[in-house]
Every structure is written in structure tokens, then in C-alpha cells.
Amino acid sequence: MASYTTTDFKPGLKFMQDGEPCVIIENEFVKPGKGQAFTRTRIRKLISGKVLDVNFKSGTSVEAADVMDLNLNYSYKDEAFWYFMHPETFEQYSADAKAVGEAEKWLLDQAECIVTLWNGSPISVTPPNFVELEVVDTDPGLKGDTAGTGGKPATLSTGAVVRVPLFIQIGEVIKVDTRSGEYVSRVK
């Protein structure tokens, strides 16, 4: 099995920690004035979803995680599972609510998602970075009401709620950044 040393660490690297695949969110090399250098990392366990801060002594090796990222198209959802299909082989994968997590509110039919597989089953789903959704409910923007933050909540077609500018009306299609859940622009 492949392994990585602390010099290979970078955000997005997947490795095994305590028998569970993990991904590095951020890392920093630290050389204190006294003592041995180390790498300070923030990792997310891919199965449990826990975020941990872990320090590794410089030169420490970790085992590479045997995970695979696939670009799959979202097909449909039933009572318990979300189904994704490989665009070339038409092979279907089913992911449970734990694997889909927060991505549920950004999933559109035929949206290309990154599905992470471990031992052949999906453990996480990453939606596209940007999605275009219709506003189904929002308060009317009052003319001249610009004293506040200049935003209002809007419910989108998938059920997600985001803050939008006052000029956005019901029925308009907007572009949303799924990583931060923020409004980006109006779609013409």
C-alpha cells in the first residue's frame, strides 16, 4: 500500500487515520525555536464527518487511503437513497443520507457530482461548485429599503435558503456557490 510523509501533505490528500479514511482540510509546517519540527493539520474523517486537529512529527509516514473519486450524474432519490449514474458505463451507485449530508440541498437532476467511494460504497458526495436554482419564495423588496445589510432570505427550488439582494423576485433563477451557500449572481 502506498504511503505519504509529512512533506507530501497538502489540502485534499486522503489517508488512513485510526482505520478510517480522512482528508486534509488545511496543513501548516511548524518549526519551533526549540524542539523538533512538526506539521499541524486539520483533517476530516470521511465516514464520521468529524473534524480534528492533528500534529505529525516531521518525517512521519501515513498510509494512503484506498478511496476513489468518481464524477457521477445525480439521477433520482427514493425514501432512503440518492442514486448516481456513471456517464460512460451507466453503472449506478446508491448513497445514503449520511454520505449525501449537506449536499442534498444542492442536488439537481443530472448534476455532475464527485462521489467518493471506499470499499465500493459511497462515503461522501460533493455537489458542483455552482448551481442555478429558481427562487420559489422570498419577501418582496421594498423600493428604497437599503438601510440594512441589503439582503433577504430566499427559498430555492431544492429547499435551500440563501440570502439574496433585495431586487431578486420569486420565479427568477440565481447562481449559488455550493461551497459557501452564498448568492453569486442572477442568471439571464
UniProtKB/Swiss-Prot annotation:
Keywords: Cytoplasm, Elongation factor, Hydroxylation, Protein biosynthesis. Its main location: cytoplasm. It holds the Pfam family EFP. Pathway: Protein biosynthesis; polypeptide chain elongation. May be beta-lysylated on the epsilon-amino group of Lys-34 by the combined action of EpmA and EpmB, and then hydroxylated on the C5 position of the same residue by EpmC (if this protein is present). Lysylation is critical for the stimulatory effect of EF-P on peptide-bond formation. The lysylation moiety may extend toward the peptidyltransferase center and stabilize the terminal 3-CCA end of the tRNA. Hydroxylation of the C5 position on Lys-34 may allow additional potential stabilizing hydrogen-bond interactions with the P-tRNA. PROSITE patterns: EFP (PS01275). GO terms for biological process: peptide biosynthetic process. The modification N6-(3,6-diaminohexanoyl)-5-hydroxylysine is found at residue 34. InterPro entries: Elong-fact-P_C, NA-bd_OB-fold, Rib_uL2_dom2, Transl_elong_fac_P/YeiP, Transl_elong_KOW-like, Transl_elong_P/YeiP_cen, Transl_elong_P/YeiP_CS, Transl_elongation_fac_P. GO terms for cellular component: cytoplasm. It is found in: Cytoplasm. SMART domains: EFP (SM01185), Elong-fact-P_C (SM00841). GO terms for molecular function: translation elongation factor activity. Signal peptide: none annotated. The keyword Cell division does not apply. Involved in peptide bond synthesis. Alleviates ribosome stalling that occurs when 3 or more consecutive Pro residues or the sequence PPG is present in a protein, possibly by augmenting the peptidyl transferase activity of the ribosome. Modification of Lys-34 is required for alleviation. Belongs to the elongation factor P family. HAMAP family: EF_P. This is Elongation factor P. It comes from Actinobacillus succinogenes (strain ATCC 55618 / DSM 22257 / CCUG 43843 / 130Z). The lineage of its organism: Bacteria, Pseudomonadati, Pseudomonadota, Gammaproteobacteria, Pasteurellales.
